[in-house]
């Protein structure tokens, strides 16, 4: 999670996707049971889908929901990427 992207609305999955795939590869080389979570700038279901396609097993969210006008709808949108 690059600190400069936290709360920025700029998803690490789009700005620097190599961070996710490199982290997944590094973790798996040590222990294949480690699940990598992606955070920093996750704002929509597209950000989530990209993170999952890069090998992330889940996401961390805060500002993406808090800054939404309808947090229930935002959570539903983000969760839909897992289905």
Feature roles, as predicted:
Residues 17, 22, 45-54, 65:
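Extended, folded domain segments that form the structural surfaces/walls around functional sites
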Residues 2-10, 52-75:
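Glycine-rich phosphate-binding active-site loops on the catalytic face of alpha/beta enzymes
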Residues 2-24, 43, 74:
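Glycine/Thr-rich beta-alpha phosphate-binding loop at enzyme active sites
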């Amino acid at each position: 999670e690059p600190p400069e992207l936290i709360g920025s609305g700029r998803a690490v999955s789009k700005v620097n996707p190599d961070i996710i795939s490199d982290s997944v590869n590094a973790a798996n080389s040590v222990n294949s049971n480690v699940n990598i979570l992606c955070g920093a700038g996750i704002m929509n279901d597209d950000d989530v889908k990209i993170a999952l396609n890069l090998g992330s097993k889940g996401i961390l969210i805060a500002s993406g929901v808090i800054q939404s006008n309808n947090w229930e709808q935002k959570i539903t949108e983000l969760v839909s990427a897992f289905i």
